[in-house]
Amino acid sequence: CSYCIVPYVRGREKSREPKEIIMEIERLVKDGVKEVMLLGQNVNSYGKNLSVPVTFAELLQEVEKIDGLERIRFMTPHPKDLSDDLIDVMSKSKKICNHVHLPVQSGSSRLLKLMNRNYTKEHYLELVDKIRSKMPDVSLTTDIIVGFPGETEEDFEETLDVVRKAKYDSAYTFIYSKRTGTPAAAMENQVPEDVVKNRFNRLLETVNEVSRSISNRYEGTVQQVLVEDVDDHDASYVTGRMTNNILVHFPGSKDLIGTLVNVRLTECRGFYYMGEQENA
């Protein structure tokens, strides 16, 4: 992307051999690990530079076969080449978490072209519809940049439109930061700081408004939670995540860390839930 310094710092993408990945996960599972995260700058590019090419969807299918592994997460897919095969594998999987982080960055097709993102607003929203048609209960999150060089009020309104239509559970929002050596750093029409701050605040308001409108949909249900830690604010509580990556806090001891627990979600508090252990 025209604003990103990562390729200049870390070099071109490299794919690890599938067997190496599988063996590492098997070792982790033997040590008691229940969930793994497969991480890549763009997971859709995985396997293209291997001597025997493998797609990321095929890798996920192999990882799913590992006995004892309960959950598989991954990030980040790029909207420009997220395949139907990957969506199909996710929708049929019993282990891949019900969460897709799909960075949009901007809702303006004009800005997306300047960002060198290689997709349009229309393509992105079609992809969101395709994902939701296969996984109706999916949790969708994103990344958004405000204040990219040349961003107009009309461009920004397009971004707000995508937020409302995609109905994100949450979004990581950023103010554009110039990175020396990137194409974007040399672009004209840098947006004034006061305009950027105003748009950033409006974006946060819209993201929170959309999130609040859908966040309580699990209230009263029983969900499986992987316990991660003792609650930071109350040692008599533990915290963990549902498969859709939403946090849950409920009464429990540190002995529950690393285990999967059925929790009744009693109250939604915005981006997280309070709950009670079911049949404790």
Residue spans of the language-model regions?
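Conserved, mostly hydrophobic/aromatic
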Residues: 21, 38, 74, 102, ...
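Radical SAM enzyme [4Fe-4S]-AdoMet core and its adjacent flexible, acidic
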Residues: 47-68, 115-118, 178-209
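Alpha-helix N-cap and loop-to-helix initiation/capping positions
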Residues: 13-20, 51-55, 116-123, 151-158, ...
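Canonical Radical SAM [4Fe-4S] cluster-binding loop centered on the CxxxCxxC motif
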Residues: 1-19
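Terminal RNA-binding accessory module
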Residues: 186-280
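Conserved SAM/AdoMet-binding glycine-rich loop
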Residues: 30-153, 164
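Glycine-rich phosphate-binding active-site loops on the catalytic face of alpha/beta enzymes
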Residues: 172-176
